[in-house]
Amino acid sequence: MDLLYIVAALVIFASLLIAKSKRKPKKNLPPGPPRLPIIGNLHQLGEKPHRAMVELSKTYGPLMSLKLGSVTTVVATSVETVRDVLKTYDLECCSRPYMTYPARITYNLKDLVFSPYDKYWRQVRKLTVVELYTAKRVQSFRHIREEEVASFVRFNKQAASSEETVNLSQKILKMSGSVICRIGFGINLEGSKLENTYQEIIVQAFEVLGSLAAVDYFPVIGTIIDRITGLHAKCEKVFHGIDSFFDQAIQRHIDDPSIKDDIIDLLLKMERGEGSLGEYELTREHTKGILMNILTAGIDTSAQTMTWAMTHLLANPRVMKKLQAEIREKIKNIDEITDDDVEQLDYFKLVLKETFRISPIVPVLVPRVAAKDLKIAGYDVPEKTWIHVNMWAVHMSPSIWKDPETFNPERFIDNQTDFKGLNFELLPFGSGRRMCPGMGMGLAVVHLTLINLLYRFDWKLPNGMKAEELSIEENYGLICVKKLPLEAIPVLTQWT
């Protein structure tokens, strides 16, 4: 008899659930491609997800649904849907989903890029804007930028004297790393624990941070898959390599109090209670988490911007000659380049905009997560849905840009579109609350380096390679890097 009561109760309970589900209005989710069991749509992303998403959007629209393993996602690929995510619903969409390996590398999300939108994030954001990346602080590091660029120029002068081919991808990354290490850590890259491995570590860090980690999409077996593929081991190698470098740099500051006025000095003062992070007490892990963003984002994003700019210039000799003519005519004292000098280089600014457009360093922004149920472009986006913003799709949209695959700086002559977060047709640094706070610092390095390389040297491709033969293919990751290293030969000029 007791069993009958239990069965009857279960039947009634099930009936109520079914009735409730029938009364619940069906959500109008964004359309998307059919999915396979278990893996969903992962197989459709391929090696270049930013391009695959664009192809899928041609069928399923500018806001589409994808199922990536167990994760429900939507992808925004038009300027209208991107504006909705980054502006209209910025507050509701500015948090981050939990991602295992970024959490590991950032000391359990004690950074700015991957941490969720909460009180801690707001305090760290305030710290970076008010203390770390102010115009005054950017200017205070000018001598470091000038010294490292001068060293880079001397290297290229020696190479030019012997007509030696330079691996610009590698050398630009090293120069950028030297600038960031001195600005952020008060330490020369040469002689540090990262001297011989930093390029490998930085590249692998971005591979880990930008990977589709199985552990995040397949909770039950993902860890096993990542151990088999080597992603877990790569993450641990990256973490311990950079952590050891941080320990060295921090200990150097502790042992020598005369090292002042860099970013570690500021953070150590806050650890000692000489500053404020709101209600949070800054610990050593907080310091390292913040430094992680500075090391990785600061080095590689600037380096890749310069590498792509030189790539497109070498592939387009007409643009290269026109830009060099402007720089050599308008720069009166190359040894004293100022922000005012950059302002008068109108064509240089067009070239930089076109580089950001055609080769966005972050093609798909770091995933966001919906904080509540939203209505975007007429579709329902449920709470906890991951949101991918495909900026490459917008930058390469033929409805916005004529001949988008062509490198053409002149397209911006009568186009006032800027890249500082207000024009959603061009967002190399993002927009809204999650916009990159280090834009000014990065641009200062990019401006000074490119102007010197183009003013002082002519450039030619090695082995008789023609401009049209230069590969501009990219590798996908958290940042978009050139698939093949950029190699070129500097040529001495009267300005060298």
From Swiss-Prot:
The Enzyme Commission number assigned here is: 1.14.-.-
What's its top-level EC category?
Answer: oxidoreductase
Keyword S-adenosyl-L-methionine attached: no
Tagged with keyword DNA-binding: no
Q: Which UniProt keywords apply?
A: Heme, Iron, Metal-binding, Monooxygenase, Oxidoreductase
Molecular-function GO terms, alphabetical: heme binding; iron ion binding; monooxygenase activity; oxidoreductase activity, acting on paired donors, with incorporation or reduction of molecular oxygen
Please list the residues that bind heme. Answer: C436
Cofactor(s), by name: heme
- What family is this protein classified in? Belongs to the cytochrome P450 family.
The protein's name is Cytochrome P450 71B1
Q: Which organism is it from?
A: Thlaspi arvense
